[in-house]
Structures are given as C-alpha cells and as structure tokens.
From Swiss-Prot:
Function (record text): RuBisCO catalyzes two reactions: the carboxylation of D-ribulose 1,5-bisphosphate, the primary event in carbon dioxide fixation, as well as the oxidative fragmentation of the pentose substrate in the photorespiration process. Both reactions occur simultaneously and in competition at the same active site.
Organism: Osmundastrum cinnamomeum
PTM annotation (N6-carboxylysine): residues: K192
Annotated binding of substrate, by residue: N114, T164, K168, R286, H318, S370
GO cellular component term, pick one: chloroplast
Gene3D superfamilies: Ribulose bisphosphate carboxylase, large subunit, C-terminal domain, RuBisCO large subunit, N-terminal domain
Other known facts: The basic functional RuBisCO is composed of a large chain homodimer in a 'head-to-tail' conformation. In form I RuBisCO this homodimer is arranged in a barrel-like tetramer with the small subunits forming a tetrameric 'cap' on each end of the 'barrel'.
Protein name: Ribulose bisphosphate carboxylase large chain
C-alpha cells in the first residue's frame, strides 16, 4: 500500500462539493450544461469543474505531488433550467492561483477551453463569471475609460455619435477621406473604419490614415469641436498592428480601433498598453462574437466576452442595439451594458446577471450601439442607453437622400432634440416620433 490507486473514478467524488463556501478571491463561473443522456447532472458539473482546472480522465500518481484541495475547481451548486429538459446551470469556483495575472488569454484557456469539447456533455455554454478584485486588479483595463474620454473630447451630457463609412470595401483612400470629412463636418463626433477594412489592394492603410487625418483637422477647424476617426489597426501580426497604431498617433489621430475577437486577447492587451501610454483612445469591434455567443445552449455568452474585454482593455465596445438589424434582447443587453460601464453590478437573473460583480476602480467602457439603426430610432436609443454610449449610424447617415453631411446633420439634430426633450421631462417612448418631427422642421 503506497497509497496510490490507479484507475478511472467518478469526477463527482472529488469535484462536486455542494457544501463549499466560495471565497472572495475565487473566480466563479456559471455554465449552462446539457449532459448526454444517462449522465447525471452532478457528474457532468463535476466534470466541467475538473476538466477546466486540475483534473484529467484518470488518477495519475503525480496528483500526490500537489495539493488538489488547494488547486482544484469545484462545482458547488447545480440548478435545473426552468422550461428546458435536461439542462442545468452548474456553478464552478476556481482558486485564484490557477490563473496568470493580467492574462485574459490564460483565463479563457482554462474556463472556456477544452472542456467545451467534452464527450459527457451534449452542449456547454459559459453564461457568466465573477472576477474578484484580487484578479481584476492585475489587468490594465480600459486605456482611459468613459470619464477621461469625455474630458479629452470636451463632450458632456449626451451620447456620442458615430458613423461607419460605407461602402465598406472598394473606396479609394481619397474618396474615403472625403466621406469622413463630410460626416464630421455635418455634426458627428466620430467616423469609423468598417471592421473589414484593414489594408487591401484598393486602399492601403497608410494612405487611408493620411487622408483621414486631413479630414479630421479640416472638420475640427470648421466646427470648433474635437473629432475622431477609428482608424483600424487590426493586422495579420502584432508587430504590424503596433506599427499602424504608432502611425495613427503620429498623424495626430485621437483614437484607433481593433477587432478583439479576430485579433485575439493577447494582441488586444498589448495595444491597450500602447494606447494608455500614448494618450490614444481604443475602439473595440467584436467581429466573430456571434459565432461564439449566438447559440443559446453552447458557446460563451457575450456578457462574458464583454467582461473579458473590460479587463483586456478598450474604451468603446460594440454591444448590440436592442432596436436595429442584429439580434439582442433588451433586458439582457442592458445587463451587460451595465457590466461594461458601472463600478458595481448587483446579481439580477432577470437581466442574465448570475453574480454580483464589483469592478472597484476599473474605468468603464462606452457601449456602442451599431447596426441597422437610423434617425427614427433615436428616441428609443437615448432612452435605452442613456448618456454614456456611442450611437453609430452607417447607412443611417450615408443613406440620406441629400448626401453624407445632411445625413450627419439630421442625426445630430435628432440626438440634441431627444436629449433636450428628456431633460425637460418628456416621455421619449411615447412622444418620440413627434419630437423627431418637430426637430426636422429646423434641420436641413
């Protein structure tokens, strides 16, 4: 008897611990699991905890060289999902020591890694996570955050306005710059590179950045307002991405952009450090998120991707519109919008928030509403998102029958009218159309 017993044993013997009291330093995760027929929920939950932390499929003698009690993930609660057959929420607690400081990449490799391919589960979805201050404090977080951005731009008391330049592919740099100028001159705060625009044969990045910088300065001089264009620094290598960010800064641009799902968290965090050190704002686009978050029973919910981005670093992030052309439910969307911009968010299952999240002093991120919205949505958007948001109208600006600048004017007039009406105590939900119609009389 050397005390080592080889062989396969049930995960639930070691990793299902219903009487465990979670620690303040634990990283907590809620998983929606659909076990294979015949697999008990406790075994499935324990398997998730084990496979995303210290466990493997069999007992190994090297287990004796460490303290599993200290390092193992524990499934501490399981609840059936109402209205679903054979679906459960498993709550898992991970000890802080399992994760590298300041690395979203490492955190995701564990908690949303191999376990998602696990045979005993038909499907698995990460619904929410609780990041303790002990861990979140090791991350850079947003390079600047909502308050500093408002101070840099000198824009207060209203949402910010943006516009994605369309057609997204095919314009020359010169014509692209012209479209940027017209939108900014008309009254928008920002214009945006479409996420597909990197550096293609029809428009190389350096040419675009230069013509855009010219447009920025011209529009600023004529309007007396600070303007920005999200120059997309996303590239095939981290080095090339940094080169583009440096060039954007040297051209006098106030903000750059990155696709954090396709570019990856490692690249994103590097860029966030550069942006903080050099006074650049960082706009984050979420291309590829729907591949990961759209299925109800498998994948990662966007609120988890949003929390990860707040830690990795970004000043703006796309987060759905509630009213536009892309999917999103109102309460759930507002739940993760608050997770992005508030300090302290109470657990509230009706909004999809499984854990109370305390960000302590980490700056907030502007949620960006973008995708199929236009001027008639303005009252709803103002009411749903409030002041701390960026509202982006691509086709909703450039599709104006008189052209880009009048489209921009229309959006700015509508926004100012909605903010004023709200401040005067009018009901945006009920009187929205009327407010917009009134405003239109004074708009070109």
């Amino acid at each position: 008897g050397i005390g080592f017993k080889a062989g396969v044993k049930d995960y639930r013997l070691t990793h299902y611990t219903p009487d465990y009291e979670t620690k303040d330093t634990d990283i907590l995760a809620a998983f929606r699991m659909t076990p294979q027929p015949g697999v008990p929920a406790e075994e499935a939950g324990a398997a998730v905890a084990a496979e995303s932390s210290t466990g493997t499929w069999t007992t190994v003698w090297t287990d004796g060289l460490t303290s599993l009690d200290r390092y193992k993930g524990r499934c501490y609660d399981i609840e059936p999902v109402a209205g679903e057959e054979n679906q459960y929420i498993a709550y898992v607690a991970y000890p802080l020591d399992l994760f590298e400081e300041g690395s979203v990449t490492n955190m995701f490799t564990s908690i949303v890694g191999n376990v998602f391919g696990f045979k005993a589960l038909r499907a698995l979805r990460s619904e929410d996570s609780r990041i303790p201050p002990a861990y979140s404090k090791t991350f850079i977080g947003p390079p600047h955050g909502i308050q500093v951005e408002r101070d840099k731009l000198n824009k207060y008391g209203r949402p910010l306005l943006g516009c994605t330049i369309k057609p997204k592919l095919g314009l020359s740099a010169k014509n692209y710059g012209r479209a940027v100028y017209e939108c900014l001159r008309g009254g928008l705060d920002f214009t945006k590179d479409d996420e597909n625009v990197n550096s293609q044969p029809f428009m190389r990045w350096r040419d675009r950045f230069l013509f855009v910088a010219e447009a920025l300065f011209k529009a600023q001089a004529e309007t007396g307002e600070i303007k920005g264009h999200y120059s997309n620094a996303t590239a095939g290598t981290c080095e090339e991405m940094m080169k583009r960010a440096v060039f954007a800064r040297e051209s006098g641009a106030p903000i750059v952009m990155h696709d954090y799902s396709t570019g990856g968290f490692t690249a994103n965090t590097s860029l966030a450090f550069y942006c903080r050190d050099n006074g650049l704002l960082l706009h984050i686009h979420r291309a590829m998120h729907a591949v990961i978050d759209r299925q109800r029973n498998h994948g990662i919910h966007f609120r988890v991707l949003a929390k990860a981005l707040r830690m990795s670093g970004g000043d703006h992030i796309h987060s759905g519109t509630v009213v536009g052309k892309l999917e999103g439910e109102r309460e759930v969307t507002l739940g993760f919008v608050d997770l992005l911009r508030d300090d302290y968010i109470e657990k509230d299952r009706s909004r999809g928030i499984y854990f109370t999240q305390d960000w302590v002093s980490m700056p907030g991120v502007f949620p960006v509403a973008s995708g199929g919205i236009h001027v008639w949505h303005m009252p709803a958007l103002t009411e749903i998102f409030g002041d701390d948001s960026v509202l982006q109208f691509g086709g909703g600006t450039l599709g104006h029958p008189w052209g880009n600048a009048p489209g921009a004017v229309a959006n700015r007039v509508a926004l100012e009218a909605c903010v004023q009406a709200r401040n005067e105590g009018r009901d945006l939900a009920r009187q929205g159309n009327e407010i917009i119609r009134e405003a239109a009389k004074w708009s070109p």
